Amino acid sequence: MNPIDTDDLEKHTPMMRQYLTMKAEHHDMLLFYRMGDFYELFYDDAKRASELLGISLTARGKSGGDPIPMAGIPYHAVEGYLAKLVQIGQSVAICEQIGDPATSKGPVERKVVRIVTPGTLTDEALLQERQDNLLAAVYQGKVGFGYATLDVSSGRFVIAELETKESLEAELQRTNPVEILYSEDFDAMELLHHFKGKRRRPEWEFDYDTSIKLLLAQFGTKDLHGFGITDARLSLQAAGCLMQYVKDTQRTALPHINAITRFNQTDTIVLDAATRRNLELTQNLSGGRDNTLAAVLDNTATAMGSRMLQRWIHQPLRDHAQIFARQTAVNELLETTAHESLHEQLKALGDIERIMARLALRTARPRDFARLRQALNLLPQLQQSLAQLSAPHTVKLGQLLGEFPEEQQLLERAIVDNPPMLIRDGGVIREGYNAELDEWRGLSEGATDYLVQLEAREKERTGIATLKVGYNRVHGYYIEVSRLQSQQVPLNYQRRQTLKNMERYITPELKEYEEKVLSSQGKALALEKQLWDELFDLILPKLHELQAFARAAAELDVLSNFAERAETLGYTCPELSSEIGVKIEAGRHPVVERVSQTPFIANPVTLHNQRRMLIVTGPNMGGKSTYMRQVALITLMAHIGCFVSADRAIIGPIDRIFTRIGASDDLASGRSTFMVEMTETANILHNATAQSLVLMDEIGRGTSTYDGLSLAWSAAEYLAQQIGAMTLFATHYFELTQLPELMAGVYNVHLDAIEHEDTIAFMHAVQEGAASKSYGLQVASLAGVPARVIKAAKHKLHQLESRDHQVEGVNVNGTRAPIQTLLALPEPVENPAVSKLKAINPDNLTPKQALDLLYELKRLS
């Protein structure tokens, strides 16, 4: 959005001058300007809002001689419109009337009281319940990047020092922020192109000294040594920018942001961006959540548990001790069936994590307090359930849950059973909590009895049987008489309102009572709001302990969920080994087995020091990619403490999981399919180690046969002999099945199929040894390729096979050609011009000789 020109404000009306001044301060976001019961937008904001929200674009008179484009939304519907805007990455400044229209001379005083951006949301109605809502900042140094994320809705603050663009891309994929701040000199914009909420920030917001001061002030510490982050210079600069941005948008204290942690890649199995994408961990290739690992594993009782599970999936642990602690807890929950009762108890807790953030920001609503009260009421019952368990990790979590009897009793006394949505209309504070409030309410609530008595008395006094006493918000209390009987009213009746068939009156007595009641209502509401504000002060001293309660409850939820998933889906506890290797018996793809219409065929895999690479061959559609992915997913599941989809699994140390599976053009970066494939392959060859699990699928298919085969052969050879990584290498180049004859530790496996006449049945079973053919024409027929095309293809295949030469390494008789023959390309012949140039000594040439030589080289080339 273009900045607003405020140089010539005098030509505008006073109200538009006020609007333009505020808009100039928030030029990069939509300004919702409160006017009565509507939020209005003007000029470019109105046009943009009309386009984004589908609301009418009109005009509001003129200002400065020009019509003013205008659009508006009702104030009571604002949350729905805000939700739409933040989902597309749009930020909004909300400007409210804070002055009294009755006493204002000129425009009513207004102020921006709230700024809503995608990454700073805390309102329950605007947040995705089961997804973290991360605000991120990235700062580029001379070498490497600083990266910081903050979840304002929970207070979780994390930084990471990243050496390369590839590691930054992986972090962006892992964290998936909804809003990103980046410095002016950031030059890797191709990594951010698909993020909707991008904000360019001035360089000074990333200043190191300023960042340190901001963080120290936020945490209330003298230094950052206690957080173990003093050497993370670049990410601290990013964190400082984040902190300033959140302070600017929230405009209040942020006590729930009380710590910062550093994400160390050495603590977790490294997953690059391609691997996270290809394995469809929490997001499928279409951008949704269906048919992902998270969708299968997530039956958590709480939203905060669901969010923690997704973080675990993206951060598989390397430390076997931590994994074993989780496994032991899950195993005990499963054996004792305690997960069943825990699930029901946890379900009633609600999203305490986000409730505590709203409490800290003082934006909590009455129902947040009611949910917190319910959670604290359930806590003793939860503690009692955990007291029956002895797994060390479960015991530790039980201790972290804490005890809050005073806060529970306070909320029980203070908040009604079913509070309204908002505090503004009262009715939140329970009767008996405050004597003065009860007194004012008594005056107000006694009005009904008084009016009934007054009506009866006046009917008797005046003899008017149709006389009624009533009330409305506009005219207050009144005595209503039909027009025909209005001649009978006493002299002390003062006409207040004339209707078609009725006259309404007020008496001095009724007027006095009205003032008394309205005064008591106003005083009751003011006192109730004061007591409401005091509740925050009484609860917030326990903020940190309540946050720890939320984290412990979320982790209990994940562990209980793992136990339930193991029982329901038939998972087993994997064994952790100190020896390098992966051994899986009857492994199943955890996602495919859930969506498959037919029984899933379980398959084994064995990788160890003497069997480091499997060359996987078989027909297209035979299940090679599914087989490889299931090995990676089972390995990952084992490292988050989850039981796995196999009869048995023994997993050794893993430092990284790489996948090179499938490819498509990267249009945003201008990279072809083959370029994407080679970039991912290069990343694997540069970074894989002997403890890495590598999945390579169809390397080289994006180029010519000889180029592709050469690259696939060389990549496999390098992985097997130079790196020694545990590798599954699927290929359609049958020549690669000769690798086991040439290299130690390389073995062939294949997925079987049975051919009958022109049909094919995929067995999906992994067998030792190489496949015999790929069944390409049969698969094409199954895919619906017209019969005429299939017939022509068979004819062409027969012609090619009949020629006296080898096609893709296959002899005329159908046997494989020696790979040495296939790769024995003719030595290149050097160009005569190059030979001539190499023989020249330029120091011995005269200018005339140099010119003659130039013409000679031109002729030779």
From Swiss-Prot:
InterPro entries: DNA_mismatch_repair_MutS (IPR005748), DNA_mismatch_repair_MutS-lik_N (IPR007695), DNA_mismatch_repair_MutS/MSH (IPR017261), DNA_mismatch_repair_MutS_C (IPR000432), DNA_mismatch_repair_MutS_clamp (IPR007861), DNA_mismatch_repair_MutS_core (IPR007696), DNA_mismatch_repair_MutS_N (IPR016151), DNA_mismatch_repair_MutS_sf (IPR036187). GO terms for cellular component: cytosol. Keywords: ATP-binding, DNA damage, DNA repair, DNA-binding, Nucleotide-binding. It holds the Pfam family MutS_V. It comes from the Bacteria. One of its GO terms (biological process) is mismatch repair. ATP binds at G618, P619, N620, M621, G622, G623, K624, S625. SMART domains: MUTSac, MUTSd. PROSITE patterns: DNA_MISMATCH_REPAIR_2. GO terms for molecular function: ATP binding; ATP-dependent DNA damage sensor activity; damaged DNA binding; mismatched DNA binding. This protein is involved in the repair of mismatches in DNA. It is possible that it carries out the mismatch recognition step. This protein has a weak ATPase activity. HAMAP family: MutS. Belongs to the DNA mismatch repair MutS family. This is DNA mismatch repair protein MutS. The gene is mutS.
